[in-house]
């Protein structure tokens, strides 16, 4: 089970967080914690006319937390900040295997594929969703 949970695609996604340097021109910041396991995510973004033009994530936690943060970085690029709450809800529903007819704001759910092993482990969903939960918590710097 652990082998499939920490498969190569998921670990590659997690590595994105470590490869992207801190933003020098960040305009907003959000911090969230998972009190159950101690994971912590700090997301900084640069916004121009409500569009996320750059982001960086500092994730202190498990590989699943880092993978979710890496996915957040991929999905947030050049997207309105308001879309991120919708994507948070969509990813949460996908993890829970709740089928929706509507496709979420111009993405293919194939982007979630590296996280497929996590679907079966409900108590790890919050780890994956932690970076996405920053969507409504950003404050100007």
Where are these regions (language model features)?
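Phosphate-handling active-site elements
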Residues: 53, 76-86
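Short, thiol/selenol-centered motifs that function as redox-active sites or metal-ligating centers
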Residues: 61-68
């Amino acid at each position: 089970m652990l082998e499939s949970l920490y498969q190569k695609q998921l670990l590659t996604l997690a590595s994105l967080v470590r490869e992207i340097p801190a933003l020098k021109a960040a305009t907003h910041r959000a911090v969230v914690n998972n009190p159950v396991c101690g994971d912590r995510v700090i997301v900084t973004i640069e916004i121009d006319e409500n569009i996320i033009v750059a982001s960086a994530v500092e994730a202190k936690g498990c590989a699943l937390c880092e993978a979710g943060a890496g996915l957040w970085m991929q999905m947030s690029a050049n997207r309105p900040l308001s879309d991120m709450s919708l994507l948070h809800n969509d990813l949460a529903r996908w993890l829970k295997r709740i089928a929706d007819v509507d496709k979420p704001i111009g993405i293919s759910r194939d982007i979630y594929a590296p996280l497929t092993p996590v679907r079966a482990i409900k108590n790890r969903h919050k780890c994956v969703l932690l970076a996405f939960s920053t969507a409504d918590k950003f404050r100007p710097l």
